[in-house]
Amino acid sequence: MQPDPRPSGAGACCRFLPLQSQCPEGAGDAVMYASTECKAEVTPSQHGNRTFSYTLEDHTKQAFGIMNELRLSQQLCDVTLQVKYQDAPAAQFMAHKVVLASSSPVFKAMFTNGLREQGMEVVSIEGIHPKVMERLIEFAYTASISMGEKCVLHVMNGAVMYQIDSVVRACSDFLVQQLDPSNAIGIANFAEQIGCVELHQRAREYIYMHFGEVAKQEEFFNLSHCQLVTLISRDDLNVRCESEVFHACINWVKYDCEQRRFYVQALLRAVRCHSLTPNFLQMQLQKCEILQSDSRCKDYLVKIFEELTLHKPTQVMPCRAPKVGRLIYTAGGYFRQSLSYLEAYNPSDGTWLRLADLQVPRSGLAGCVVGGLLYAVGGRNNSPDGNTDSSALDCYNPMTNQWSPCAPMSVPRNRIGVGVIDGHIYAVGGSHGCIHHNSVERYEPERDEWHLVAPMLTRRIGVGVAVLNRLLYAVGGFDGTNRLNSAECYYPERNEWRMITAMNTIRSGAGVCVLHNCIYAAGGYDGQDQLNSVERYDVETETWTFVAPMKHRRSALGITVHQGRIYVLGGYDGHTFLDSVECYDPDTDTWSEVTRMTSGRSGVGVAVTMEPCRKQIDQQNCTC
């Protein structure tokens, strides 16, 4: 056949040359067939540079399926694993080295790195249960594994031994989903033993977050004293009050008092005892049998009791800061009329949440937190129908996104200040119509009762209130005639007020808070202008000093502290109801605008507590 002389291009044909056998004479048909050479020639298209590719998507699955069939029928297998585990009967599993090596770096090293197993047809395996090995071999061929819940720990341990990371991750994810108070410590210990960092971290985080429930379980009582000290020393332990930690330690000791009574002192030093109330300490010193039998521990707590009741500044461990979202809550406020809004700002991502409204609109109220619950205290309902001063106390639960009414105060209090000592709310000053109060009353949440305490030395509305070293400070305000720069301090043990150094500036409606053992007073109204100046009171030197001013003048502002920084929200600048939010960094002595409220307002109640349950709310992402 002669070659076709036509040029390449559309309609180009192929040239076929005759096949010529390269077989030696007499080699046989089979050999001749295998060695036949194709010499077909193809004339390319006019494009000339095209490529052809083809992928069979299911090839790997099909190939491994066939190899698994070969394994099950014991064909072409080149290794037998002889698995022996403790007293369990030995088992043999035939397999293909290449498949095992493809799924496990341990098997790959065993069969390719010149180890003695590389040339062995029977390999002895110890330290893993035959049923676990059977499942891991099945996974190598099928990429699928299933087991009962009780077997997960054993399979995960085997997967760790043979470095089958995908199985380790799957088991870890399953165990994370199974975490509950009764098994979290056991899972954490298991993860630590096998070196699974992620599972260990997730289990520990669960323990920290649910400490109160975990501390009631059998696993908790089986902790060693070193493990318990490490646990209760965590700053991120999530407890409503430090007495939970104290009781957990005492109960742990009682579980085996004869052996554990020697560890009481070490445990108490890990408890944040300065966060316990004097009343609680006094009761434990009187009634706790374990403390009665240990004079050193008793003396240690007596010393702390004295420091608390003498209001001494102490170098103590920091307050616990659980890794649960803590948001800045703003309740009520005023813009043309009193508002019922409850909103929460998340400084970590800049978002606002709209939550359950106050049952009655209020401005000039105060906010505080006790045991994770947000309280809205006093204020006034300014509405087109009239103005009504409020004696109300309402409690908001972030877990249910609901308000509940509590016992009202003895008198209505608008432009009130509040502070919390030993879990009790102190309502300070305020006004009822033209009456300017110097009276103060204390609310006990356990009893839902208010009781009057000693009145202030000065009548004050628009008063700033803060608590430091268990002392209640009332700063500035208006007495009905004059705006004030004076300040006074309440001693709960003596039930008396004492004047302290006056501020440098007259301030009514200032924002007052505590940061790093100092009292800050920001903004306010001096009788002529709204202020942007800020001053700080050092309780050691008993002096007020100015710090950097805010970027905006504001009175009737909201103020709080979040993660070591001061936040001021809203207020009135003399012309406008502000929506701006500023943040003060004490390390750099600077203010910065961080966000805007959803609308301008003054006279809000502000406090910080846990993030609300997302199932109960609809999140509103507010952009500034």
UniProtKB/Swiss-Prot annotation:
User: Which residue positions does S-nitrosocysteine occur at?
Assistant: 151
> PTMs?
Non-enzymatic covalent modifications of reactive cysteines by electrophile metabolites inactivate the BCR(KEAP1) complex. Accumulation of fumarate promotes the formation of cysteine S-succination (S-(2-succinyl)cysteine), leading to inactivate the BCR(KEAP1) complex and promote NFE2L2/NRF2 nuclear accumulation and activation. Nitric oxide-dependent 8-Nitro-cGMP formation promotes cysteine guanylation (S-cGMP-cysteine), leading to NFE2L2/NRF2 nuclear accumulation and activation.
> What PROSITE patterns does the entry give?
BTB
In terms of Pfam families, this protein maps to: BACK, BTB, Kelch_1, Kelch_KLHDC2_KLHL20_DRC7
The GO annotation for biological process reads:
cellular response to interleukin-4; cellular response to oxidative stress; in utero embryonic development; negative regulation of response to oxidative stress; negative regulation of transcription by RNA polymerase II; positive regulation of proteasomal ubiquitin-dependent protein catabolic process; proteasome-mediated ubiquitin-dependent protein catabolic process; protein ubiquitination
**Effect on the protein upon substituting residue 167 to F:** In a lung adenocarcinoma patient
What cellular-component terms does GO give this entry?
Answer: actin filament; centriolar satellite; Cul3-RING ubiquitin ligase complex; cytoplasm; cytosol; endoplasmic reticulum; inclusion body; midbody
Q: What does the UniProt entry say about where the protein is found?
A: Cytoplasm; Nucleus
Question: At what sequence positions does the UniProt record place the cross-link N5-[4-(S-L-cysteinyl)-5-methyl-1H-imidazol-2-yl]-L-ornithine (Cys-Arg) (interchain with R-135 in KEAP1)?
Answer: 151
Describe the effect of residue 436 to A: Loss of interaction with NFE2L2/NRF2. Abolishes repression of NFE2L2/NRF2-dependent gene expression. Does not affect interaction with SQSTM1/p62
Q: How, per the record, is this protein's activity regulated? A: Ubiquitin ligase activity of the BCR(KEAP1) complex is inhibited by oxidative stress and electrophile metabolites such as sulforaphane. Electrophile metabolites react with reactive cysteine residues in KEAP1 and trigger non-enzymatic covalent modifications of these cysteine residues, leading to inactivate the ubiquitin ligase activity of the BCR(KEAP1) complex. Selective autophagy also inactivates the BCR(KEAP1) complex via interaction between KEAP1 and SQSTM1/p62, which sequesters the complex in inclusion bodies and promotes its degradation.
Span of domain BTB: 77-149
UniProt keyword annotations, A-Z: Cytoplasm, Host-virus interaction, Kelch repeat, Nucleus, Repeat, S-nitrosylation, Ubl conjugation, Ubl conjugation pathway
Result of mutating residue 483 to A?
A: Loss of interaction with NFE2L2/NRF2. Abolishes repression of NFE2L2/NRF2-dependent gene expression. Loss of interaction with PGAM5. Does not affect interaction with SQSTM1/p62
**Which Gene3D superfamilies does the entry link to?**
1.25.40.420, Kelch-type beta propeller (2.120.10.80), Potassium Channel Kv1.1, Chain A (3.30.710.10)
**Residue positions of the PTM S-(2-succinyl)cysteine?**
38, 151, 241, 288, 319, 613
Expression (tissue specificity): Broadly expressed, with highest levels in skeletal muscle.
Q: In which pathway does it act?
A: Protein modification; protein ubiquitination
Task: Please indicate which residues carry the site annotation Sensor for electrophilic agents.
Answer: 151, 257, 273, 288, 434
Gene Ontology MF terms in the entry:
disordered domain specific binding; identical protein binding; RNA polymerase II-specific DNA-binding transcription factor binding; transcription regulator inhibitor activity; ubiquitin-like ligase-substrate adaptor activity
Subunit comment: Component of the BCR(KEAP1) E3 ubiquitin ligase complex, at least composed of 2 molecules of CUL3, 2 molecules of KEAP1, and RBX1. Interacts with NFE2L2/NRF2; the interaction is direct. Forms a ternary complex with NFE2L2/NRF2 and PGAM5. Interacts with (phosphorylated) SQSTM1/p62; the interaction is direct and inactivates the BCR(KEAP1) complex by sequestering it in inclusion bodies, promoting its degradation. Interacts with NFE2L1. Interacts with BPTF and PTMA. Interacts with MAP1LC3B. Interacts indirectly with ENC1. Interacts with SESN1 and SESN2. Interacts with HSP90AA1 and HSP90AB1. (Microbial infection) Interacts with ebolavirus protein VP24; this interaction activates transcription factor NFE2L2/NRF2 by blocking its interaction with KEAP1.
Physiological role = Substrate-specific adapter of a BCR (BTB-CUL3-RBX1) E3 ubiquitin ligase complex that regulates the response to oxidative stress by targeting NFE2L2/NRF2 for ubiquitination. KEAP1 acts as a key sensor of oxidative and electrophilic stress: in normal conditions, the BCR(KEAP1) complex mediates ubiquitination and degradation of NFE2L2/NRF2, a transcription factor regulating expression of many cytoprotective genes.
- What protein family is recorded? Belongs to the KEAP1 family.
Q: What is this protein called?
A: Kelch-like ECH-associated protein 1
What is the organism of origin for this protein? Homo sapiens (Human)
